[in-house]
């Protein structure tokens, strides 16, 4: 099983960017933790980060036929990108959306997610553990062969 892990804009700045909100772990450390969990579960991950909406859409589209699911933190694009939402729907893979902070407890504009409508589920507010919980949930969902539509 292969999972695409998509990290949206500004996540390359983790560790130094607003640590009171996003924590002190770097994106590299989060990816290392995801690789370790993937090894434990018996799957592989392909992490991808970009600050560019188009590059994120390209990576999502490339997952069709090569990946079994997508774990995504769309970051700020959560609240603005119909293009990312449509790309996720188009590839028709199971998607789990994750966020480091609880987007529903922050500014009002952050509480709406375009991605949620095409995701199997959303895990938010557990810091870096949101990624690990999301990977475990996505793996289990795929293993059980649950069919979902985005």
Swiss-Prot record:
It comes from the Bacteria. It is an enzyme of class 4 (lyase). The active site is at residues 22, 99. Pfam families: DHquinase_II. Substrate binds at residues 73, 79, 86, 100-101, 110. GO terms for molecular function: 3-dehydroquinate dehydratase activity. The keyword Nucleotide-binding does not apply. The keyword Repeat does not apply. The record marks 17 as: Transition state stabilizer. It catalyses: 3-dehydroquinate = 3-dehydroshikimate + H2O. Keywords: Amino-acid biosynthesis, Aromatic amino acid biosynthesis, Lyase. Its EC number is 4.2.1.10. One of its GO terms (biological process) is aromatic amino acid family biosynthetic process. Pathway: Metabolic intermediate biosynthesis; chorismate biosynthesis; chorismate from D-erythrose 4-phosphate and phosphoenolpyruvate: step 3/7. PANTHER family: CATABOLIC 3-DEHYDROQUINASE. Homododecamer. Belongs to the type-II 3-dehydroquinase family. Catalyzes a trans-dehydration via an enolate intermediate. This is 3-dehydroquinate dehydratase.
């Amino acid at each position: 099983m292969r999972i695409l892990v998509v990290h949206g804009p500004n996540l390359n700045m983790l560790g130094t960017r607003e640590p009171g909100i996003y924590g002190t772990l770097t994106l590299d450390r989060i990816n290392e933790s995801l690789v370790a969990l993937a090894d434990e579960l018996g799957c592989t991950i392909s992490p991808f980060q970009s600050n560019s909406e188009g590059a994120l859409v390209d990576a999502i589209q490339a997952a069709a036929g090569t990946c079994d699911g997508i774990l995504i933190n769309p970051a700020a694009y959560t609240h603005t990108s119909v293009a990312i939402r449509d790309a996720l729907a188009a590839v028709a893979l199971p998607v789990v959306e994750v966020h480091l902070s609880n987007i529903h407890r922050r500014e009002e504009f952050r509480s709406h997610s375009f991605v949620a409508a095409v995701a199997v589920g959303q895990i938010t507010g557990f810091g870096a553990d949101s990624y690990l919980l999301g990977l475990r949930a996505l793996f289990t969902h795929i293993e059980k062969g649950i069919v979902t539509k985005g």
